[in-house]
Amino acid sequence: MSLSLPDIVGLFETKGHAQYDGEPVTQLEHALQSAHLAEQEGADSALIAASLLHDLGHLLHDFGGTPTQQGLDDLHQYRCLPFLRALFGPATLEPIRLHVDAKRFLCAREPGYLEALSRDSQRSLQLQGGVFDSAQASAFEALPYAKDAVRLRRWDDTAKCADAKTPDLAHYVRHLEAALKPTAIAA
C-alpha cells in the first residue's frame, strides 16, 4: 500500500493537472507553490517535502468534483499517510496529518484568519469539525510538530495564485530524497 518516489512523481504527473477545487490553480501548481514558499522561507527538506505532499490525499480518492460541495470531508490529510509511511518520518508526516487542524487552530487564535480563508476552505472547515474551542486549541498547540503544521498551513493558504512561477516537480524530488527515512533509502 505504500508509494515509491517514482509513484509519487507519476501521481502528480497523471492527476496533478486536475483543478484544485474552488481555487484558480491545479493540484500540482498548488503543491509546487506550497513547496516553493517553504523553500523560500528556509524550511528543511522534511518540511518542504510535507509542503509538496500535504494534499496528495486529494489525488488518492475517486469522489470526483469538489467533495466539499457534496458535503463530504475527503480526509485527505489522513488518506495519504499509509501510502507515505514507509518513505518518510514524522518530521514530514506529522505536519501533513496536522495541517487541517492547524487551520482550525488558527481560526480560533488569530483574529481575521477565518474571514481571510477562501470560500472552499471555509466550507471544508465546517466539514472538518469547525473552529477549535479554547481547550482544543491549547491541546493542538502542545503537540509535537504543531508549529511546523502551522507554517505548512500558512503556505497552503498562500499557494493558490494563478500563473505563479515555481521550479518544476523535478526540482523538489531532491527534497523528497533528502527527507526519506534511512530504511527507505536502504530498500
Question: Which residues does each predicted region cover?
Answer:
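Extended, non-globular alpha-helical segments
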Residues: M1-L11
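Metal-dependent nucleotide-binding catalytic modules
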Residues: P6, V25, Q122-A187
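Short Gly/charged-rich anion-binding patches and loops
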Residues: D7, Q33, R79
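Active-site flanking loop/helix segments enriched in acidic
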Residues: V9-L32, G57-H61, P67
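Residues that form generic nucleotide/phosphate-binding pockets
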Residues: L11-K15, F83, P95, W155, ...
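Divalent metal-dependent catalytic cores for phosphoryl transfer on phosphate-bearing substrates
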Residues: L37-R154
